[in-house]
Every structure is written in C-alpha cells, then in structure tokens.
C-alpha cells in the first residue's frame, strides 16, 4: 500500500522546515540555501523574469541606467517577495552559497537557457546596487513605533 510520504522526493526529509514567508532580512547562508532549493520556477514565473530582464537590458542599452526602477505587484502569496529577493541577490556578487555565487543557484531553477543567459548578461554588463524595500513591513514598523497620546 502506497502512503503519502512515498510520493514525495526521497532525497528530502518530508518533515523539513519550509519557510511560509520569504523575508528580505533573512540572508544567512543556510537559510538562503534552503529557500532557493525549494523555489519552484513555473513557466509563468520564468516568463516574468525574462520579461523584466529584457526590459532592464533595453533600458540600460538606451542610456536609461539611472532611471531603472521596478514596482512588483500581485496577490498575497503570489511570490512577489521571493521573486524580488532572489533577483536582487543574483545581482550581488558577494552573496554565495557553499562558495558558489547566488546567481548560479537561481539560474539552476530556470528551465530555459535563454532566461539563464539573459540573467548572466544583465548581471555582468550592468552592475547594480539593489535596494530591497518591503513597504508593508516598513509601514508596520512605523505604526508600532508611533507615539500614542
């Protein structure tokens, strides 16, 4: 008789911790390794990465390197935080997991060679400083520190 546990990938502990919420501040190497290894890039997510990277490349090549800003929106739980966190970390050469640049771990999650190549090209040709800002958490932090009279 097959049990549910047998359906899952045998190389991973079914009782492992999987983060429910991806936060920008959690950047310890072991945590990033766990997060990125669990990250499932669907066809739609990969298309969004590809579209954004193409737009970034076009903007940079047309002289708009000082004008690139990105607003990511979506429903609760749709993957906005993981999408932006992993893209941002891919542009930071100092972020590594087991000595391997984070960008390589993200590329391993993609299925299409074109997306992998585009990420490599944009990251190398246009070095960037990435500021990850979670407006909701900033707003909540401000609300908890407000004076009450």
Language model features with spans:
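Walker A/P-loop-proximal flanking segment of P-loop NTPase domains
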Residues: 1-78, 85-91, 108, 130-133
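P-loop NTPase motor core
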Residues: 40-44, 70-75, 82-149
């Amino acid at each position: 008789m097959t049990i549910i546990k047998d359906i899952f990938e045998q190389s991973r502990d079914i009782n492992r911790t999987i983060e429910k919420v991806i936060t920008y501040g959690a950047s310890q190497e072991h945590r990033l390794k766990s997060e990125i290894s669990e990250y499932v890039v669907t066809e739609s997510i990969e298309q969004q990465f590809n579209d954004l990277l193409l737009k970034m490349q076009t903007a940079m090549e047309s002289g708009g390197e000082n004008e690139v800003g990105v607003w990511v929106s979506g429903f609760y739980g749709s993957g906005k935080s993981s999408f932006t966190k992993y893209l941002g970390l891919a542009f930071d050469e100092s972020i590594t997991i087991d000595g391997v640049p984070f960008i390589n771990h993200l590329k391993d999650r993609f299925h299409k060679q074109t997306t992998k190549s585009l990420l490599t090209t944009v990251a190398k040709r246009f070095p960037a400083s990435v500021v990850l800002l979670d407006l909701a958490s900033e707003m909540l932090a401000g609300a908890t520190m407000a004076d009450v009279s």
